[in-house]
Amino acid sequence: MLKEFKQFALKGNMVDLAVGVIIGSAFGGLVNSVVNDIFMPIIGLITGGIDFSNMFIQLAGDKKATLLAAKEAGATLSYGNFITLLINFLIISWILFFLVKGMNKMTQKQEEVEKPKEMSPEGKLLTEIRDLLAAQKE
């Protein structure tokens, strides 16, 4: 049973998946930082200094100035957080699209290099002549 588990755990796909998950988690932190520290301030500047993370609609109670106070007072719709996550998703999707596109291009080039070139008609004819001459000598 231990041998079977070892075979399962050391399969190429399992190791590739583990590496992918670890890289994905590190990549997620990097993308979150890019979105929160670079893109959101620029978007806030373009929109007049709006802080998306503090945007909300209070559904119950008196109007509060901050999201935290509004959540303590009752139900709120935190649409600013949704906007931030939507922008985050779009940026991640955009980056992944270009990564996959680049990887596909590299894979395609590698397949083209590995693929043997088809022989020209002259080459085929010369090969046939060589084979016929070799058969006549035997």
UniProtKB/Swiss-Prot annotation:
Membrane topology qualifier: Multi-pass membrane protein
Keyword check for Protein biosynthesis: no
Keyword annotations from UniProtKB, A to Z: Cell inner membrane, Cell membrane, Ion channel, Ion transport, Membrane, Transmembrane, Transmembrane helix, Transport
Positions of disulphide bridges: none
SUPFAM superfamilies on file: Gated mechanosensitive channel (SSF81330)
Subunit structure comment from the entry: Homopentamer.
Full protein name: Large-conductance mechanosensitive channel
Gene: mscL
